[in-house]
């Protein structure tokens, strides 16, 4: 950070990170046992990214300005085992008995049919995914006025450009040559041997926006905020994907080019009033949208749509904020309603497609109440209580390909209707040194895994405890994460592997030491 002159300051930041993980967060407790899962191919994720940011802050007369630019690059590769797919279509699928669909492509069918022998290749399959993302954002805003002025204002421009080439390759080295290269009755593609499915896609997003906001003091206790954001976005998809083994040309998938443009004006409105006890009563309205996208589908077999459209959100919130004069109590409560127009969501239903896909499920509404209460007691306890009640549901039937998949009133996926938490902190002295302990408990209510054919995901409670001793230039912490060793069902996979559940970390007890140089 440096002062260029008395009116202009520059801040340059660079962050570089690389992480590598192996294994998976899912397990099969009912069939294999607690924290156990079955894999043939080792799984890993390799994630590397760099971000450079430049911020310029300065003054021009009575107004101030800020420029913020960010340049982001990310390369990711991960590999995951896909043998549950092979097993399902070899042995477990309805109508498959013994010599299954998947075996048909890895075994010599004629040896089995005429001689009763199994001349089979290794059926192991895995998915290899990679992306190389580049994103640049630029924002310039000017503001004027300070708290207490009749009018405070803000205007700005924004630009966002994203380029994201990504590739999914489902590798099946044991695929019989006649199916993968088309040499013997098959319909594969020469040079694509050993590949079951390949998706080579490029997505480009470009967004331009101008915005303005004014805070108008109606009187000494009431402020009115009005704002507008005009945006123009352009999304370009270049999608090439499809089966390369064992199917006709009609099933090779898509070479789809699509350009979608969106533009509009999103309003913002807020009014707040300070009450006699210095509490704040407020109302907010805001509007936003999410851009469209594309799915991985083949031309004929999947019910999943090739494209899904943008959606729009109108958010209404009314709330109350209170803090007493000595800061020992703070209380916030808010009620909100989120109206979604043609809501986007992810659907995983094997009756509709063999992979998860995104689609527009129609209008939806989420209403809720949330509160938090902070208390500092006379004997030094710092306590934070939080809770929320949510009603997330469809406002109309979800219809896909002329068939009702979920009726109006269905609970939205992966949204808990109840949540609660408590955090307690206490400072104390030990051996003449400052110390403190923290206790955190949270409760998450039950959820549904999908909008169609949902699996009930039970409620769970997580807790953690830590105690820290502070030295002059060091800290030592004893901690216990997941005190009760809870196995939360974060999400239950409805795929080919039975009852696969993604869970949290098991109980961990440890010591952390920090030394300040």
PLM feature spans:
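Acidic/polar loop-and-plug regions of large Gram-negative outer-membrane beta-barrel proteins
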Residues: 1-53, 87-126, 172-203, 343-349
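Transmembrane beta-barrel wall of Gram-negative outer-membrane proteins
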Residues: 1-21, 47-54, 133-134, 142-148, ...
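Residue-level signature of outer-membrane beta-barrel architecture
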Residues: 2, 57-60, 134, 144-146, ...
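Repeated loop/turn-to-beta-strand initiation elements of outer-membrane beta-barrel proteins
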Residues: 6-10, 62-65, 150-151, 221-224, ...
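Membrane-embedded beta-barrel scaffold of Gram-negative outer-membrane proteins
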Residues: 55-59, 64-82, 274, 280-290, ...
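Signature of Gram-negative outer-membrane beta-barrel scaffolds
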Residues: 152-276, 303, 384-386, 391-393, ...
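Gram-negative outer-membrane beta-barrel transporters
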Residues: 217-224, 337-339, 359-451, 514-516
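C-terminal beta-signal and adjacent terminal beta-strands/loops
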Residues: 339, 382, 442-450, 469-517
